[in-house]
């Protein structure tokens, strides 16, 4: 260490009342790292706020929560994971590939879409507060509407409390249903019009492989988050894409309610 470095450390020690030279070095390193990292942290915090309302409060406390949870982030687009899951039935037909590249999504575990937004007129007339209620209305014997357990500002489709899930013979997706607290699907129609929903493994594989969505960043085995089947669906941009998205919601309801229309695949 040079004479000048030694003098600097002595000054830092005197300034903060630190007598231990090693502690002074550590404090200097932390201070320099904080100064360097501050612009990134500030941008990252703004990105977190831009994601809109979610389960994490939109303040420093919420930001710290998502930063800690990000330590458990999982890969979101691989397909091999689906073949390891026991459910082999499908409720979706073969889907057409989604037009264009995948949208850019947020780097945070609060999953949002950052580009390819639907036209505002289409969103307000065809998506906002209409998609989830419209699909649920076809399944009132097994489902009901309530606020999401994951996104406290979103209306969600739930399996009725009267439907038993303790016996695997009644609902083969019983573990998934339990982990989502009976929630089947919700749309972020207060923000970017994306959705989260639970899909049977082979339906999830179809959705991800055709570019219609990806898994939740905390969805995976051994992770303290939603089940592997919890899937993020990109916002529909037109009537054709909306029709596909509604089919995906229908498939989610079919899986979570054990609709016998599910087809076993080889």
From Swiss-Prot:
Domain of life, source organism: Eukaryota
UniProt keyword annotation of Oxidoreductase present: yes
Broadest EC class assigned to this enzyme: oxidoreductase
Subcellular location(s) of the protein: Membrane
Major subcellular location class: membrane
GO molecular function: oxidoreductase activity
InterPro entries in the cross-refs: Luciferase (IPR048273), Luciferase_dom (IPR040841)
Name this protein carries in UniProt: Luciferase
Organism of origin: Armillaria mellea (Honey mushroom)
Lineage: Eukaryota, Fungi, Dikarya, Basidiomycota, Agaricomycotina
Gene assigned in the entry: luz
